[in-house]
Every structure is written in structure tokens, then in C-alpha cells.
């Protein structure tokens, strides 16, 4: 029962945190026009989260695909004991901005390395490149500002800012991150498919 309560708490926090900037005053008047032209990083971040929350035309289905523990940083005994098939699922909303870059809010639940449920949710951004003539093919590089909770940490919600990379064609995208760490801890490649509808 405690697992369920903490999981619900973690999911609620993960969904509410990115929504908070949508309640902030987005277009406050400021006498300094130079500052209005170039908002700071935090202002830009909260504005993008609010815009994504309020004006995202796309719905996304997330399907976890792989967790891979870096063989150079784990003992064989640990590798043999870990789950590397993170079945689960998730849902999100997303949009492309005027520069063609991708913004998303998401919630996903998957089986972690110990085969226990792990929720994660938050905001994600990717700078998008379309290197081919076929503009449906794209590459992305960015970050996710998320919150997760794990069984081995008693499902206490913790922030998880992580790098993000992707390769996509039309509605299907493979996204991935790398969780840094120390020997026998962290250093995990985590990838999932995202289907936009």
C-alpha cells in the first residue's frame, strides 16, 4: 500500500511541477526593452513549459525499449542481476516551436534495473535538425527536466535533469538518455519510442 501511495504522490508532483509556470504572468510589462527582448534562462524555461502545457497540438504515446548498463562500469555479477527490458508505457503532449524545435511534457512508468516500477515525468526540449532532403527525417539533441521515484530510494521523488537525444521519422521517434554515475551505480543508457498522434 505504501508503494502505491508514494507512486501516486510522485506522479502527481511530476505532473503538477511543470504546470505551475502556466499560472505565472507570462507577458508582464517591463520598462527595460533590452531585457524584454532577451529573457533569462529561467524565464525562457518557464515560458516554454507554460506554452507547452497550454498550447500543445500533439499527443504522444511512450513505450520504453531498453536499459543498458555500461559494461565498462559494472561488474559482470551486477549486469547479470539487472533487468534491461523496461516494459511499461507513458503519455505526453508536445509541440514544435517557430524554429522547428520540439517541446514536450510527459509521464512514463517502467520497470527499472531491479524490475520494480519507476515513474518519471517532466518537461523535455530538443533542438531539431533535418539534415536530409526528406524533411520527415530528423535528429534531436536536448534535455529533460524531470522528477522520478525509485523503489530502492523508498519512492521519494527526486529531480532528474538528464541529457536527451533522438532520431525520428514522421510520427515515430526513438529518444534516449544516459544516466551518469559511479562504478556499479548509474551509467545507464535508457531508450524509448515515442509515437505522435
From Swiss-Prot:
GO MF entry, a single one: acyltransferase activity
SUPFAM superfamilies with a match to the protein in the record: OMPA-like
Main subcellular location of this protein, as a coarse class: membrane
Annotated TM spans: none
Top EC class, one word: transferase
Alphabetical list of Gene3D superfamilies matching this protein: 2.40.160.20
Reaction it catalyzes: a lipid A + a 1,2-diacyl-sn-glycero-3-phosphocholine = a hepta-acyl lipid A + a 2-acyl-sn-glycero-3-phosphocholine; a lipid IVA + a 1,2-diacyl-sn-glycero-3-phosphocholine = a lipid IVB + a 2-acyl-sn-glycero-3-phosphocholine; a lipid IIA + a 1,2-diacyl-sn-glycero-3-phosphocholine = a lipid IIB + a 2-acyl-sn-glycero-3-phosphocholine
Cell compartment(s), UniProt: Cell outer membrane
Annotated site residues (Role in lipopolysaccharide recognition) in this chain: 78
One GO term (biological process): lipid A biosynthetic process
Record: active site: 69, 112, 113
Signal sequence annotation: 1-24
EC annotation from Swiss-Prot or TrEMBL: 2.3.1.251
HAMAP family given in the database record: PagP_transferase
Family of this protein: Belongs to the lipid A palmitoyltransferase family.
Function: Transfers a fatty acid residue from the sn-1 position of a phospholipid to the N-linked hydroxyfatty acid chain on the proximal unit of lipid A or its precursors.
Protein name: Lipid A acyltransferase PagP
Organism of this sequence: Serratia proteamaculans (strain 568)
Amino acid at each position: 500500500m505504501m508503494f502505491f501511495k508514494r507512486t501516486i504522490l510522485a506522479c502527481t508532483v511530476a505532473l503538477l511541477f511543470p504546470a505551475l509556470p502556466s499560472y505565472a504572468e507570462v507577458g508582464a510589462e517591463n520598462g527595460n526593452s533590452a531585457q524584454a527582448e532577451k529573457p533569462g534562462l529561467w524565464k525562457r524555461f518557464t515560458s516554454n513549459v507554460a506554452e507547452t502545457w497550454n498550447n500543445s497540438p500533439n499527443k504522444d504515446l511512450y513505450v520504453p525499449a531498453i536499459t543498458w548498463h555500461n559494461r565498462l562500469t559494472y561488474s559482470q555479477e551486477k549486469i547479470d542481476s539487472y533487468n534491461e527490458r523496461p516494459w511499461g508505457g507513458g503519455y505526453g503532449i508536445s509541440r514544435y516551436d517557430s524554429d522547428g524545435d520540439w517541446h514536450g511534457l510527459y509521464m512514463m512508468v517502467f520497470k527499472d534495473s531491479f524490475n520494480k516500477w519507476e515513474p518519471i515525468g517532466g518537461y523535455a526540449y530538443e533542438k531539431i535538425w533535418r539534415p536530409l532532403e526528406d524533411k520527415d527525417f530528423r535528429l534531436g539533441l536536448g534535455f529533460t527536466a524531470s522528477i522520478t521515484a525509485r523503489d530502492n530510494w523508498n519512492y521519494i521523488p527526486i529531480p532528474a535533469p538528464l541529457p536527451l537525444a533522438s532520431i525520428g521519422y514522421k510520427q515515430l521517434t526513438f529518444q534516449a538518455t544516459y544516466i551518469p554515475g559511479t562504478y556499479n551505480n548509474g551509467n545507464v543508457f535508457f531508450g524509448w519510442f515515442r509515437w505522435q498522434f
